[in-house]
Amino acid sequence: MALDGLAGYVYKAAAEGRVLTLAALLLHRTEPEIRTLLSTVTQHGGQRSTPLIIAARNGHSKVVRLLLEHYKVDVQQTGTVRFDGYIIDGATALWCAAGAGHYEVVKLLVSHEANVNHTTVTNSTPLRAACFDGRLDIVRFLVENNANISIANKYDNTCLMIAAYKGHSDVVHYLLRQHADPNARAHCGATALHFAAEAGHLDIVRELVKWKAAMVVNGHGMTPLKVAAESCKADVVELLLAHSDCDAKSRIEALELLGASFANDRENYNITKTYQYLYLAMLERFRDPSNILHKEVLPPIEAYGMRTECRNPQELGAILHNTDDLHLEGLIVRERILGSDNIDVSHPIIYRGAVYADNMQFEQCIKLWLHALQLRQKGNRNTHKDLLRFAQVFSQMIHLNEPVKSRDVERVLECSVLEIERGIARIQNPQEPDAHSTLENHECNLYTFLYLVCISTKTCCSEEEQPCINKQIYRLVHLDPRTREGGSLLHLAVDSGTPVDDFHTNDVCSFPSAPVAKLLIDCGANVNAVDQMGNSPLHVIVQYNRPISDFLTLHAIIISLVEAGAHTDMTNKEKKTPLDRSTTGVSEILLKTQMKLSLKCLAARAVRLHNIKYQNQIPRTLEEFVEFH
């Protein structure tokens, strides 16, 4: 059997822990062959690993012992493995065994001089893997064998931080006794106390406080107290308020933020606790009549119904039994305390909007979502999901015969243009490892823009409103964004392969779309734009495979393209004209009835057909014209 084929069997035996089968497969093989077989990297299930790595990953100590003691396999081999949905590049057998909780394999590897401080591509150590998994026995063994507890990963996230976040109190206690720094800061500015507070691990918060963990702000201006309040971790908030030496303002804002967060949190919704904590905070503000701590309230915001936040116990008492007012009060309080640029402000706004949409209260939903969208764009956050959410709710409204305001569509189109503009800039300056997702998001935004254009064609617009919508379409058309295949907006509008989101959107939008194509053309879309294969929109539409049942769409698009100056004799990179690319007799007939070849087109085709030299003989604009033919 060839070595390539045999390597697969060797890997399978190691992965399944079949030590006798593995030994039999390697019997009578030469040393170079054995070295090759045991160092071959096999790709399987998204992993790239050697027999040693997969055996360690799966906890097969007998296989690991055989490979190390009999075949002297390099204990420092690295591969790519999957753990809890994460892909780990550069992992050793020791990292895998530690992360998977295989204590005997860990001991075996360390006894064969595996490097306990070897780091993966993201600077993760075997000790960090064990802390993630919460295996105190492995953590203790590694530390006793010189594992460095201070090595942080590439985000400066320490072993103590991951153990605190995952809730492994015994590991946290052990690391602190081994002098792990409770005040080390991650790249985002957070400490172990931030992570424990966010996750609501009360015992760990108590332990960290005992070890003098400081109440510092992270990169978003959040203390562990604020993080706990924002995450609805009431017991942690109360513990920190009892132990930390915070001023009156911090104490009051923690109670207000906790109450406000209970009002609009999908997982922790509790309107009773909302009022309870807001009322406690209000009492704190009015505790000393000679020194009332007044709120610095936000100016009224349209999304919140132009409400002003309650400023005294009487105003708060007046909304006790009005849950809708309490929901909005919660959103206003959160935005005041966290600041409009905080990354967490928008999520509850979106949630509350979704609840309104579920209850058919679309106007309130759209106001809230527009506010959240503007906050996220102001903070330069990625908004492709927010934009799609609007296409979905507008489609739902149209499907239910609910009126959609053209002004709302225009505002979302405007935000969509901005997001696509930013997306183009991100693509031109890619930041690894986000390059692929940046391109994915960019294409999603192009599709969403087309959904919004399609929705605009089904929305009642006044004579004053239509030009406002057209202005946003014009802006994007002249940016000329492209897909990875080089398709323009017009290509997508006439392509039956353009994907349509299936949550409400496909009830209203479909492609090819004659109204969308016409509107794009009216706003200046180039009817002779070509993709990477040299195909024009006309090349695309003539391949539509529903020419009978959707004849009107096919006919209208071909007419619109030709009347706007689409060249019916234009060739793609395979030298095929739209007529050559037609896949049905109907599209052929429609094309032939529209073909009005100019003398200029005939001359260009003759030049190309007879290979007459024309480069540098005619004006550059004419050269491009000839090349199209």
Curated annotation (Swiss-Prot):
Q: Which GO terms describe its cellular component?
A: Cul2-RING ubiquitin ligase complex; cytoplasm; nucleus; ubiquitin ligase complex
Keywords of this entry? ANK repeat, Apoptosis, Cytoplasm, Nucleus, Repeat, TPR repeat, Ubl conjugation pathway
GO BP, sorted A to Z: apoptotic process; proteasome-mediated ubiquitin-dependent protein catabolic process; protein ubiquitination; regulation of DNA damage checkpoint; ubiquitin-dependent protein catabolic process via the C-end degron rule pathway
Pathway membership of this protein? Protein modification; protein ubiquitination
| SMART domains to which the protein is assigned, alphabetical | ANK
Pfam families for this protein: Ank, Ank_2
Q: Where are the ANK repeats?
A: 47-77, 89-118, 122-151, 155-184, 188-217, 220-250, 485-529, 533-570
Q: Does the keyword Secreted apply?
A: no
Q: Which Gene3D superfamilies match?
A: Ankyrin repeat-containing domain (1.25.40.20)
The subcellular localization recorded is:
Cytoplasm; Nucleus
Can you say where the TPR repeats lie in this chain? 346-379
Q: Which domain of life is it from?
A: Eukaryota
Q: How does it assemble?
A: Component of a CRL2 E3 ubiquitin-protein ligase complex, also named ECS (Elongin BC-CUL2/5-SOCS-box protein) complex.
Which family would the database say this protein is a member of? Belongs to the fem-1 family.
User: Could you tell me what this protein does?
Assistant: Substrate-recognition component of a Cul2-RING (CRL2) E3 ubiquitin-protein ligase complex of the DesCEND (destruction via C-end degrons) pathway, which recognizes a C-degron located at the extreme C terminus of target proteins, leading to their ubiquitination and degradation. The C-degron recognized by the DesCEND pathway is usually a motif of less than ten residues and can be present in full-length proteins, truncated proteins or proteolytically cleaved forms.
Which protein are we looking at?
A: Protein fem-1 homolog B
* Species per Swiss-Prot/TrEMBL record: Xenopus laevis
- Please name the gene that encodes this protein: fem1b
